[in-house]
UniProtKB/Swiss-Prot annotation:
Homodimer. Its EC number is 5.1.1.7. GO terms for biological process: lysine biosynthetic process via diaminopimelate. This is Diaminopimelate epimerase. Keywords: Amino-acid biosynthesis, Cytoplasm, Isomerase, Lysine biosynthesis. HAMAP family: DAP_epimerase. The active site is at C75, C224. GO terms for molecular function: diaminopimelate epimerase activity. One of its GO terms (cellular component) is cytosol. Pathway: Amino-acid biosynthesis; L-lysine biosynthesis via DAP pathway; DL-2,6-diaminopimelate from LL-2,6-diaminopimelate: step 1/1. It comes from the Bacteria.
Length: 279
C-alpha cells in the first residue's frame, strides 16, 4: 500500500509528515524512518512525524521518530509543521484555527495565524532536576548556572524541560563553538540519563539571542523550537534577557515569550510545505 507524505520545514528543521489518522500506531517503524531521513539514499529529513487520532479529548496525537530512530517527547518546529499539515488535510472542512495536540511531552496548542505563522502554547517550563532529568542537582532543586565538566572545560549550564530536556550554556560567540565535536559529548554526558539537547546562546541584546543547537537524536540542525523556548527561559532565570525576545537560529528567527501572566511559554514561527509524494 502506497503511503502519502508531505515534506515540511520550520526554519530548515525538516520533517516528513504522515497522515496516520486511521491508526493509533505509527505506520512506519523506527528503522524505516532512519532510511527515509537519510539525505543521500532517502527523502532526507531531521525526523518523521505521524498525525494520529487524538487521546484524552485532544484533536490529534503527534509522534516523532528522529533521524536516528529514537523517539523524542516533543518537537517545537515539528508541531508547527504538524499544524500546517493538519490544515492541509482538513482543507475546506477545517473549522478551527488551533488544535489541541497530545504529545509524549504533554498537550500542546498550535494556532494558525493570519500572516501564515504558527503560534504555539508550549506550556509551563519544568525546571526541577528530577523533571529534566539530570543528576546535576537534587531532584527537587532547579539547575541554574551549575558547573559541568565537558571535554576538559567547565561550562556553566542551566537546564529546562519544555516537553523534552535541554541544557543551555551562554557563550561569547556561538560561531566559535565546534558543535560537531562538543555536541555529542553533552548529549551523552552521564549527568543526563535520558541524554540531552544542548543550546549554545550568545546574548546580543536583552531582546535578541543567537543560538546554535545539538539535538538529541538528530545532531546539528538549523533550528529547534523547544530549544529556543528553553533558552529564553534560561536567559530569564539567569538575568541575561527579557521575557520576550527574538531567538535567531541558523535557519531564521523565532519569537519567544515567557508570559508573566500565566507563566506559559509561547513560540511563534513559520511552517512551510516543501513537496508531497508517495512511498
Amino acid at each position: 500500500m502506497a503511503i502519502e507524505f508531505t515534506k515540511y520545514h520550520g526554519l530548515g528543521n525538516d520533517f516528513i509528515l504522515i497522515d496516520n489518522r486511521s491508526s493509533s500506531l505509527p505506520v512506519l517503524t523506527p528503522e524505516q524512518a532512519i532510511q527515509l531521513c537519510d539525505r543521500h539514499f532517502g527523502i532526507g529529513a531531521d525526523g518523521v512525524i505521524f498525525a494520529l487520532p487524538g487521546e484524552n479529548g485532544t484533536d490529534y496525537t503527534m509522534r516523532i521518530f528522529n533521524s536516528d530512530g529514537s523517539e523524542p517527547e516533543m518537537c517545537g518546529n515539528g508541531i508547527r509543521c504538524l499544524a500546517g499539515f493538519l490544515a492541509d488535510l482538513e482543507g475546506q472542512s477545517r473549522n478551527k484555527d488551533s488544535y489541541r495536540i497530545h504529545t509524549l511531552g504533554g498537550v500542546m496548542t498550535p494556532q494558525l495565524l493570519s500572516d501564515g505563522l504558527v503560534k504555539v502554547d508550549m506550556g509551563l517550563p519544568r525546571l526541577l532536576a528530577g523533571e529534566i532529568p539530570t543528576t546535576l542537582a537534587p531532584v527537587e532543586e532547579k539547575v541554574i548556572s551549575v558547573p559541568l565538566e565537558v571535554a576538559g572545560k567547565t561550562w556553566e549550564v542551566t537546564c529546562v524541560n519544555m516537553g523534552n530536556p535541554h541544557c543551555i550554556t551562554f557563550v561569547e560567540d556561538v560561531a566559535a563553538i565546534e558543535l560537531e565535536s562538543i555536541g555529542p559529548k553533552f548529549e551523552h554526558h552521564p549527568a543526563f540519563p535520558q541524554r540531552i539537547n544542548t543550546e549554545f546562546i550568545q546574548v546580543v541584546r536583552r531582546d535578541y539571542l543567537k543560538m546554535r543547537v545539538w539535538e538529541r537524536g538528530a545532531g546539528i540542525t538549523l533550528a529547534c523550537g523547544t530549544g529556543a523556548c528553553a533558552s529564553l527561559v534560561a536567559g530569564v532565570l539567569t538575568g541575561k534577557c527579557d521575557r520576550t525576545a527574538t531567538v535567531e537560529l541558523p535557519g531564521g528567527p523565532l519569537q519567544i515569550e515567557w508570559s508573566e501572566i500565566d507563566q506559559r511559554v509561547y513560540m511563534t514561527g513559520p511552517a512551510e510545505r516543501v513537496f508531497t509524494g508517495k512511498l
